[in-house]
């Protein structure tokens, strides 16, 4: 955008002195004093700016193909890759993807897309497939513990006097041994 602006400014800067001189000459021709000067006078040809802008929209020669920044998968566009026709004969290698030499290649790295990829045949289709699972150690699923509320059905009996006395005797025995 800045290039276009600078180009238009340069065109106007070049053409304005000629336009100003032409206007001054028109004022002098109204007097009609010097007819010889009008006959030998050379003026710059008038080129309108909109003609230049419509004629050369890019203002510079384009030596490269204009390509989109993001490639699209359009079936009507030329793709830089093509496949040679394959005739299957014994002991013949399948040709790989070829690059067209006359199309401008992008400078970024190529990313393979599933649309352009060839699927190679599986070479081990002839052999019998053996399972590779370990039959010695069988895998057992781990049980998941379930959390259920525990309800006790036992009835708590009242404490007997023996249970109350027995701790007192032990405390008396420990107190007597501590005093000695």
Swiss-Prot record:
Entry keyword Signal: yes
Residue numbers of Phosphoserine PTMs: 160
Entry-linked InterPro entries: Casein_kappa
Residues with glycosylation annotation: 132, 142, 147, 153, 160
Localization terms from the record: Secreted
Keywords: Glycoprotein, Milk protein, Phosphoprotein, Secreted, Signal
GO cellular component, one term: extracellular space
Chief location category: secreted
Recorded superkingdom: Eukaryota
Distribution of this protein across tissues and organs: Mammary gland specific. Secreted in milk.
Pfam family of the protein (one): Casein_kappa
Signal peptide: 1-21
GO BP: lactation; protein stabilization
Site, as annotated: Cleavage: 116-117
Function: Kappa-casein stabilizes micelle formation, preventing casein precipitation in milk.
Family, similarity comment: Belongs to the kappa-casein family.
Name of the protein in its database record: Kappa-casein
Gene: CSN3
